[in-house]
Amino acid sequence: MTTMTPGMQLPPGGRPRLATGSWRVDPAQSHASFAVSVVGRPVRGRLPLSGGVLITEPIEDSRARLIARAGAVSTGSPVLDRLLAGSGFLDAAAFPEISFRSELLTWTPAGWRVIGRLQVKNAEHELACRLALHLGGTRPDGSPRILITSSWVIDSRWITRQWIPGLGRRVVMTCSCSLEPDRGLTGGADEH
């Protein structure tokens, strides 16, 4: 017997999944956070996320698109934020968006996995990551808040070609997306 809450299904065996349909990323509750080592010290920051998800049957044909505004990078330091958004790093004036587009969603014995393309500064990079699905409280209208978290590691050379003394090669990313039903979506995640 499948246990259901509005928007989430928990079939026998316990692997939760979104119900089929269109979902919108709530930008007020969603972000990508990052950590990178610079001269042996961690630098942490965030980027707000928007986008959409289309869950289909079979699940492998589902699609997701996440978008982060490069100019909205936030580390808690206005000077560092300007540096990261500037031409030496994210170059937000020339490349205002960083995006992820899924190509395959699948369940493995270790959990949900997604394979897709991360676009940074007009260059695409293949990316695979694991996903976790959670109920995250209740929305003001009483419907459940559904959270998807994912994590991956990217190469700092995807962000900058400049040699920066002490900049670590690994950038650890974690995305936290709060999803809500998208009743106005007509064509799926590719429209976001």
Protein language model annotation of sequence segments:
Residues M1-H192:
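Low-complexity, acidic/polar, glycine-enriched regions of mature
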